[in-house]
Amino acid sequence: MIALIIGMLVSLIVTLVGTPLLIRLVHKLHYGQYIRQDGPQSHLVKRGTPTLGGVVINFAILLGWASSALYRYLRSGDVPSWSAALVLFAMLSMGLLGFIDDFAKVRKKQNEGLSVGGKFIGQFIFATIYAVLALLIPTKSGFPSAQAGISFIEQPFFNFDFAGRAVAIILFVIWVNFLMTAWTNAVNLTDGLDGLAAGSSMIAFTGFGIIAFWESYHIKGGSHGGYSYAVSDPLDLTVIAVCAAVACFGFLWYNSNPASIFMGDTGSLALGGLFAALSIATHTEFLAVVLGGLYVMEAMSDVIQVGYFKMTHKRVFKMAPIHHHFELEGWTETKVVVRFWMIELIFVLLALTIFYGDWVTRSGLLFS
């Protein structure tokens, strides 16, 4: 618990101290955000607002986890886990793609950064590296960092091993690429209003922290009763998830309306990659759809809008993603953000209820 608190404090301090320093640096370099002309007219005043805030979020999570790991090593000789390294790799690699995209935008002073093809190739390379390493390299706990299948909670309901190991690896790589692409784009679409992505991510990663902590408390081979989980190094995953939540909380101090800085793709792609990796590492890929319900809602509104327009040349929403629709309906930006936070909180509470209900059922406690 002390290690967890240390990680949280370090992450909070890094964001609270580092963000204003980054704001000054970005102002000095004139690296302001470009605002799309076809968006809500109220957003045009945001042109020139410093971006690249995701750099601080990434460092806060990394340093928070590192300080926690250092404390555990000095106290008990516990070395950092492979599972934690892989999850952080997913976050930092996607964050790197986002940084390249952000940097290209501010240099060109337009809303066109990394090409769609370039971003896809980068995501494919990093997601494939993550998938292969997670599946093939053993961890100190004896459990794999990932399992060759698709899980709702812990146990896979579809196993990729049905046609041999080689096919399982290929299918798993495809599955991981889908998850990484889906979640990075979903979080990226959510990052369209001041504080929306930071606040909803704070709530979502808190949920992941609770799930990972429960899995660590009921780890297979442990002394606690009830159903146990064959998850690799869930305590490390808890620290990372909670550090992410706290980093978003600290960043929100400067990102709330009116925002002094935006996280940019550096932050949104990193958080999306981290969300995907945590769902894989905790074996909750499908539960994550509920846990990150707001991200799903934002992404699906965009998919529906584009698909329906291509078929009928009409629009379902006034503008997509859906948070812009409500702005054009007359809601203030702050009202949209706070209400969407509330929606994400409901999704997280629902996911935690499902998770706990599953544990109670598997433990045989439902009718005892």
From Swiss-Prot:
Pfam families for this protein: Glycos_transf_4
Secretion signal, residue range per the UniProt entry: none
Subcellular location: Cell membrane
Any one biological process term the GO annotation gives: cell division
Source species, domain of life: Bacteria
Transmembrane segments: 2-22, 51-71, 80-100, 117-137, 167-187, 193-213, 234-254, 271-291, 340-360
Catalytic activity line of the entry: UDP-N-acetyl-alpha-D-muramoyl-L-alanyl-gamma-D-glutamyl-meso-2,6-diaminopimeloyl-D-alanyl-D-alanine + di-trans,octa-cis-undecaprenyl phosphate = di-trans,octa-cis-undecaprenyl diphospho-N-acetyl-alpha-D-muramoyl-L-alanyl-D-glutamyl-meso-2,6-diaminopimeloyl-D-alanyl-D-alanine + UMP
Matches recorded under CDD domains: GT_MraY
PANTHER family given in the database record: PHOSPHO-N-ACETYLMURAMOYL-PENTAPEPTIDE-TRANSFERASE (PTHR22926), PHOSPHO-N-ACETYLMURAMOYL-PENTAPEPTIDE-TRANSFERASE HOMOLOG (PTHR22926:SF5)
Protein name: Phospho-N-acetylmuramoyl-pentapeptide-transferase
Organism the protein comes from: Bifidobacterium longum (strain NCC 2705)
